[in-house]
Amino acid sequence: MPLYRQEKDWLQYGFELSRATIANWIIECTDKYLRVLYEFYHRLLLSIEFAMADESPIQVLKEEGHEATAKSYMWLFRSGEDDTPPIVLYKYASTRRGDVAKEFLKGFNGYLMADGYTGYNKVQDIKRCCCFSL
């Protein structure tokens, strides 16, 4: 549920709770409890034989140091094995530089399926696979 709706709901009950406070709670809980889980799955992803990657532009309206019209990127990394539950990890970056993939996939030495973006060439010790989507 969007934070502005939660803010309105709390106000209906007579409790003034700002979106900033709710957002800070979410960030704090995520950092404290979910980071460990994310890091566990990140290590697991690096240990498998086949992974997929893609990056998509997103627009962040209020980001410190960036104009509202600047492009940022959400990177997606996914396991490719069929016999296990999929691992899907997102990484936000303010850039599309291949260094993002290089750093995230450091230690991965399997097959990486991605589109033709040359930034993935910066990832060392991998075997590149072509993406067959049209």
Stretch-by-stretch model annotation:
Residues M1-L134:
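Catalytic center-proximal scaffold of phosphoryl-transfer enzymes
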